Curated annotation (Swiss-Prot):
Residues in coiled coil: none
InterPro entries registered for this protein in UniProt: PX_dom, PX_dom_sf, Ypt35_PX
UniProt-listed Gene3D superfamilies: Phox-like domain
Family in the record: Belongs to the YPT35 family.
Comp. bias (Acidic residues): 16-31
Name of the protein in its database record: Endosomal/vacuolar adapter protein YPT35
Modified residues (Phosphoserine): S65, S66
Species annotation: Saccharomyces cerevisiae (strain ATCC 204508 / S288c) (Baker's yeast)
Disruption phenotype: Decreases VPS13 levels at endosomal membranes and nuclear envelope-vacuole contact sites.
Biased composition (Low complexity): 38-58
Gene Ontology CC annotations of this record: endosome; endosome membrane; nucleus-vacuole junction; vacuolar membrane
Pfam families given in the database record: PX (PF00787)
Entry superkingdom: Eukaryota
Amino acid sequence: MSDKISFLPPEPIQLLDEDSTEPELDIDSQQENEGPISASNSNDSTSHSNDCGATITRTRPRRSSSINANFSFQKAHVSDCTIVNGDHGTKFAVWRITVFLEPNLKAFAAKRESYKIQTYKRYSDFVRLRENLLTRIKTAKPEKLNCLQIPHLPPSVQWYSSWKYQEVNLNKDWLAKRQRGLEYFLNHIILNSSLVEMTKDILIQFLEPSKRVA
């Protein structure tokens, strides 16, 4: 983060239902702008998949993307945000990112432990991630591009609302919509095995565990 920041007391804004253990991905509202993702129904869930190794399901992803020999990405959860004080009286939201991993080796799977990565990111970090991904896939062969589509991020504050930027950007409803959009974006990326294979170093750097600044 470019700003010198200090975290407020740990009282995250509650945007999700505490009773929900599995985050519901807001897929339907995104499909129109996100390329060829087809939907298929099963008995207990609604699944959206494509031919590029990505499957995003409302209850649980059916596939995972290998990040190394030991683990594959299983799903990402963008949860509570904390409002942070920046310089010059500014405030911004920092999101808690949890990425669950699925062990590839029986030795890890037998332990029945929950493997996950947790980090903290702000919206601008997602913007840089998307820019880096777009730059990387430009080097791909033309026939591969259909499998390397990068979804859009939830929108930033519109120019005509910039005069009240802080009020809009920290509004609870606005943050709830942004949370769903960021979660959709990240799951779309990490569950696309072709995209993960090509951008593995970028994703690993993005998911480096963060240290809170006192």
